[in-house]
Amino acid sequence: MQNRPLSRMALRLLSIAFALAVASLQPARPQATHPAPPVIHVDNGPNSAAAQKQHYVVLVSLDGFRWDYAKRFGARHLLALGRAGVWAPEGMLPSYPSFTFPNHYAIVTGLYPEHNGLVANNFYDETRNARYAISDPSAVTDGSWYSGVPLWSLAESQGMRSACFFWPGSEAKIAGYRPTYYLQFDNKIDDNARIEQVLAWLKLPETDRPHFITLYYAEPDHEGHEFGPDAAQTRAAALKVDGLIGKLKAGLDATHLPIDLVVVSDHGMTKTEDGWVTLDQFADLAGFETVGPLLYGKSEADRARVYNQLKHASEKFVAYRRKDVPPGLHYSQNPREGDPLIVATGAYAIRAHGPPAGQDDRPPSAGMHGLDPRQMPEMKASFFAAGPDIIAGKSVAPFENVNLYPWVAHLLGLQSPKSDGSIDVLAGTLRDGGNEAAK
């Protein structure tokens, strides 16, 4: 049968169908961005003579960049960074719970969340009768919520200037210091403007130039939540930030300064299973303060009662009295953790309560984290680093992120306080073997 030419209408319909199919494969529409506002400058004095002799560390976080994204998605700049230095091909272990604020702060203090004060993104403190929420600027900028000595405060206390283009805790005065240079969090600041600011800091006179710098990108966490870890949008976001790392690395190389570039993530991502698991369907939580899945009983009798109601309630979680939480979680020594504690057995979104009557009950996001990385390997984070102080072509087995703190402090020539981490874990990646006398 002879083929007949397509009509204009048919061609138009085919064009529309093709356009829609292509659009379905594209990442979500990027949000509007704007230039960076003026940097906040704290007068911590000039770099000491000793600090001016030290090398530089630029610590970058790619939020939610799961340990296997680089190889799965072909993140060529990150993989090249790993080949030029060191990386963790099987991932880095976040601290429990594998949320953003607890783990960013664990990285820069070397303290598990039970010791660093940030036991979750949002939690309640019974002694203060107050709540910490990452969306509350008055809490985020209040240094009394935070424990430990973050790397920027450690540097400032030893005469070395620091700068933070975002990092949880960097807007607060902690251990007596704020970074010499920092910005208030605003995720709409243009991605390239962030890199330009980092490079501008490195062009300052030696007396004012920060030797420790942080940089943060919220991607691909957002896409992982909205679309899931296997989505095309998540892949596109991962490759986008990989491109930014390539641009940053080229800019750092052009400074000809001795800079160690360290790229990490805070946690991974997994596909959310089923719908919500709502605890008040299994237990009477009357009289409890609750924040997400965290439960704060006002009396021992209430805590024991709710524990007994929950301990055999569902296969989707395990209930513990706080004192009985397995030691490997490092999550039993801070009252902010609540009591009893609920630990998910899989990728289940757990909450204490649903919305009030009459309000829509939205399903959980497509992707989630916060789970135990020892039970859920999808929670593992990423680690790449290269620079003049780091051995090239080295790979490391999975390690806990608290071990980064003494390692970065060593790169900067700083004396670090005792923490939950150890320089010994990553000493084999250092050209001087972690020997203080060699610095």
Show the residue positions of the predicted features.
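Bacterial N-terminal signal peptides that target proteins for export
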Residues: Q2-L14
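Active-site nucleophile/metal-coordination loop of metallo-enzymes that catalyze phosphate/sulfate
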Residues: T33-Q54, W67-S157, K173-I174
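A long, amphipathic alpha-helix that forms part
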Residues: V39, Q52, D191-K203, I213, ...
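Loop/turn elements at helix/coil->beta-strand transitions in domains of secreted/extracellular proteins
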Residues: K53-V57, A84-A88, S157-A163, T207-I213, ...
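His/Asp/Glu-rich, glycine-adjacent segments
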Residues: L111-G228, E315
